[in-house]
């Protein structure tokens, strides 16, 4: 449902222009004057700004929930030398670009809370247990005004962090690193909950509520025609049988309601909530999460299905599925023991049962974020286009559902999920 930023995919058939700022409107307030106090706080020997440049942090059409720019600053220091500093600035979308819908998701309040409170708490828990870990980039500035929330973070690319090409997905080595890091995040969130009580209400809420039923059922009905039309062109054996299994708009929404309901008698974690390849960066053996806007308390099956469905490369997505769960579980057990979890730790068998119980996350992800993950960068892609009624919206939806990369993924996923009883 949420289509977040997509990093360049270095794909030759993409229609991305060479100039990253060609379609970017940079808010006028992002300037030297805004950054000077930040630099004075962050850089002990700061004297002055010599050069200030703002460029797009993502390719055109690849960021649907925020304005995100890379700020490059050359500064003079007290000894007369110069330093080059880089930051990522994220701020709220304007209303006419989808900001009203985004505001309803509490994305920026969640991310503000994660950077200000939760991530520091988690790191402290591990440090008290004698282990230094890192989970996310350093956030150097947070500002909340009536107009919205702004976050300024270190630019991980300056530390040689990179995304993996989303069109290819994660290989086994990267999946292993991510699954272990997810387990570290989840374990700390459980201990934090055990010691400090419930998280803020926004981490228990979702857009799947009765107030939004008409919107979601309308969106589901609107995309159904193009989805089925594209499906019939896929190289999927017994395609008509799979079409019969597609949920109605009401069934789709009811499934979403059930997925977001939390059973507090079960093992729950604070999920990252948007765990796909562009929200994970790598540098050597270091792995960090970015984009903490969708955090949600609930079953770890949410993050696991979302990650595997959206981001494991095609050659291992289904083949290594059970292995992925085992890798995550092994590290989760290690971390929960390290952090002295007082309750029974879920067994591997119990985790697999959770994956089945919450298996609707698989098709929810496959029909949502995966569609966009495998789409080459497109300046015309936007949340408004996705939801637009009429011929233009219909054409766009058919285009994304008939994308050969999406077809290849779904031709694998449909039989896999059917055999698990998840359709």
PLM features: what roles do these ranges have?
Residues 7, 160-272, 385-423:
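ATP-dependent phospho-/nucleotidyl transfer catalytic cores
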Residues 110, 173, 177-180, 222, ...:
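Generic recognition of stable, solvent-exposed alpha-helical segments in well-folded globular domains
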Residues 162-171, 289-293, 306-313:
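Short helix/strand-bridging catalytic loops that position acidic/His residues to coordinate divalent metals
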Residues 55-225, 300-301, 338:
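Conserved ATP-binding subdomain of kinase catalytic cores across diverse folds
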Residues 1-67, 74-84, 196, 243-266, ...:
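Regulatory N- and C-terminal appendages and interdomain linkers associated
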Residues 67-78, 88, 248-300:
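Active-site acidic catalytic loop and adjacent metal/ATP-binding pocket
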Residues 113, 117, 294-338, 361-383, ...:
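Active-site activation/catalytic loop segments of kinase-like enzymes and analogous catalytic loops
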């Amino acid at each position: 449902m949420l289509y977040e930023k997509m990093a360049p995919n270095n794909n030759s058939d993409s229609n991305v222009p060479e100039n990253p700022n060609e379609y970017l409107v940079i808010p006028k307030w992002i300037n030297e004057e805004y950054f000077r106090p930040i630099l004075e706080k962050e850089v002990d020997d700061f004297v002055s700004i010599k050069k200030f440049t703002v460029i797009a942090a993502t390719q055109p059409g690849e960021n649907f929930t925020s304005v995100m720019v890379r700020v490059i600053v050359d500064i003079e220091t007290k000894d007369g030398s110069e330093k080059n500093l880089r930051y990522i600035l994220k701020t709220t979308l304007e209303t006419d670009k989808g900001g009203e819908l985004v505001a309803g998701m509490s994305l920026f309040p969640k991310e503000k809370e994660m950077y200000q409170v939760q991530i520091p708490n988690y790191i402290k828990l591990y440090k008290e247990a004698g282990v230094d870990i890192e989970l996310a980039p350093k956030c150097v500035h947070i500002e909340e005004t009536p107009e919205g929330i702004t976050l300024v973070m270190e630019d991980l690319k300056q530390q040689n962090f990179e995304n993996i090409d989303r069109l290819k997905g994660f290989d086994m080595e990267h999946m292993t690193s991510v699954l272990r890091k997810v387990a570290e995040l989840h374990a700390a969130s459980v201990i934090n909950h055990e010691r400090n009580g419930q998280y803020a209400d926004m981490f228990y809420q979702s857009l799947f509520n009765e107030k939004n039923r008409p919107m979601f059922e309308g969106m589901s009905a609107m995309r159904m025609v193009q989805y089925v039309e594209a499906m019939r062109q896929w190289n999927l054996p017994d395609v008509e049988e799979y079409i019969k299994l597609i949920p109605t708009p009401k069934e789709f929404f009811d499934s979403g309601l059930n997925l977001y309901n939390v059973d507090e008698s079960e093992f729950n974690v604070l999920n990252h909530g948007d765990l796909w390849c562009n929200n994970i960066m790598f540098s050597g053996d270091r792995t960090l999460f970015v984009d903490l806007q969708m955090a949600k308390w609930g079953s770890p099956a949410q993050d696991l299905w979302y990650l595997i469905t959206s981001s494991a490369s095609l050659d291992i997505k289904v083949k290594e599925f059970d292995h992925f769960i085992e890798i995550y579980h092994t590290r989760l057990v290690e971390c929960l023991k390290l952090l002295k979890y007082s309750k029974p730790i879920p067994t591997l068998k119990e985790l697999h049962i959770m994956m089945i119980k919450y298996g609707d996350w698989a098709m929810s992800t496959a029909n949502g974020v995966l569609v966009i993950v495998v789409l080459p960068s497109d300046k015309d892609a936007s949340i408004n286009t996705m939801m637009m009624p009429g011929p233009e919206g219909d054409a766009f939806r058919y285009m994304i559902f008939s994308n050969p990369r999406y077809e290849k993924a779904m031709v694998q996923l449909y039989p896999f999920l059917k055999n698990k009883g998840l359709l």
